[in-house]
C-alpha cells in the first residue's frame, strides 16, 4: 500500500512630533506615568492546526470550516534492477461543522490521479477518479485554560467511493470500508504549541487484500512567531499490519511546515520526508491547504 505571500512586512516610519494646538494642555504627570506602565500587548493567539497531525480543538457550535487541500506524493521501492516507483496527486475538500459544545463532525471528499511503473508487462500504469470519502466526529472531553491543554477522541468511517482498479487502470481507493479512531492532544506553553495523535484504522467486511490495520503515531511542535506565522516540525510514524508471510510496512517521516493563520483563513504549506522505512514503498509528500471559517 502506498502510504499516502507574498508576505508584506509593514514598516513604521518615524514622523516628527506635531506641536500641541494653541491652548491645548499638556498631558498630566499621572497620565504620562499610567501610559508608561500600561501592560504589554497580549501574545498572539495560538493555532493548534498542523500539517499532518490532528488537533484536539473542535469547531465551535454553529460554525463551519471549509478546507481545500492538494497533497502530491511520490514513492519507490528499494533495489536497482527491480525498482518500482510512482506518484499520486490528490485534491480533497472537507467541511467541518460544530454540532455541540466540544463536538464537531467532518466529511472529506477527494479526487486522485495515480501513475506508477507497471509491476509486470501489460499491467496498468495510470488511474484517475474519485477518492474514498471519510465521515468523522470529534469530542473534546478535557479542556484546561492553565496550562492550556485539550484532549479529544475522534471516530470515523471511510467509504470506498474511490474508483476501483481494472485490468486497464489503477484504482484510486482501498476497495473496502474502513473504521478507525484517534486519541488527540493539543497543548500550549508560552508561544509554543504542541500536538499528538495516536490512531488506528482497519478494514471491515470481506477481505480484499492482506491489510489488517494501520497504526498512526504523530507528534508536532510549533512556535507562534507572529500572529500570522507559525513554523512547525513533526514526526509521523505509520505501521501497516499485514497478513501471512507479507512483512508489515513501517515508515517514519520528518515534517517541516508553515502554518499561516490570518483572521478567518488558515494556510498550511509543508512537506514530509522518510527518514526510516522497512518493507514499504516510500517517498516524499507535500501539502498545501487553505481553510476558511464561517
Show which residues each predicted segment covers.
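Transmembrane beta-barrel domains of Gram-negative outer membranes and organellar outer membranes
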Residues: 22-292
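N-terminal signal peptide c-region/cleavage motif recognized by signal peptidases
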Residues: 16-17
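Sec-dependent signal peptide recognition
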Residues: 2-10
Amino acid at each position: 500500500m502506498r502510504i499516502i505571500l507574498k508576505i508584506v512586512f509593514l514598516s513604521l516610519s518615524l514622523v516628527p512630533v506635531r506641536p500641541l494646538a494653541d491652548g491645548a494642555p499638556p498631558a498630566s504627570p499621572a497620565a504620562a506615568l499610567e501610559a508608561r506602565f500600561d501592560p504589554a500587548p497580549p501574545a498572539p493567539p495560538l493555532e493548534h492546526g498542523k500539517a499532518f497531525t490532528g488537533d484536539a480543538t473542535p469547531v465551535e457550535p454553529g460554525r463551519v470550516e471549509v478546507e481545500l487541500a492538494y497533497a502530491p506524493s511520490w514513492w519507490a521501492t528499494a533495489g536497482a534492477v527491480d525498482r518500482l516507483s510512482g506518484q499520486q496527486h490528490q485534491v480533497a475538500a472537507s467541511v467541518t461543522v460544530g454540532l455541540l459544545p466540544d463536538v464537531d463532525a467532518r466529511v472529506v471528499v477527494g479526487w486522485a490521479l495515480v501513475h506508477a511503473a507497471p509491476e509486470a508487462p501489460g499491467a496498468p500504469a495510470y488511474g484517475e477518479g474519485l477518492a474514498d470519502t471519510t465521515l468523522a466526529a470529534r469530542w473534546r472531553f478535557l479542556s484546561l485554560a492553565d496550562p492550556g491543554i485539550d484532549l479529544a477522541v475522534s471516530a470515523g468511517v471511510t467509504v470506498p467511493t474511490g474508483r476501483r482498479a481494472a485490468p486497464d487502470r489503477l484504482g484510486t481507493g482501498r476497495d473496502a470500508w474502513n473504521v478507525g479512531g484517534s486519541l488527540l492532544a493539543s497543548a500550549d506553553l508560552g508561544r509554543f504549541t504542541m500536538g499528538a495523535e495516536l490512531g488506528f484504522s482497519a478494514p471491515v467486511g470481506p477481505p480484499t487484500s492482506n491489510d489488517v490495520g494501520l497504526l498512526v503515531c504523530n507528534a508536532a511542535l510549533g512556535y507562534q512567531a507572529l500572529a500570522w506565522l507559525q513554523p512547525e516540525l513533526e514526526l509521523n510514524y505509520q505501521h501497516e499490519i499485514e497478513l501471512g508471510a507479507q512483512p508489515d510496512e513501517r515508515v517514519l517521516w520528518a515534517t517541516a511546515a508553515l502554518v499561516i493563520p490570518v483572521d478567518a483563513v488558515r494556510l498550511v504549506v509543508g512537506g514530509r520526508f522518510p527518514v526510516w522505512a522497512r518493507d514499504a514503498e516510500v517517498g516524499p509528500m507535500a501539502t498545501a491547504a487553505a481553510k476558511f471559517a464561517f
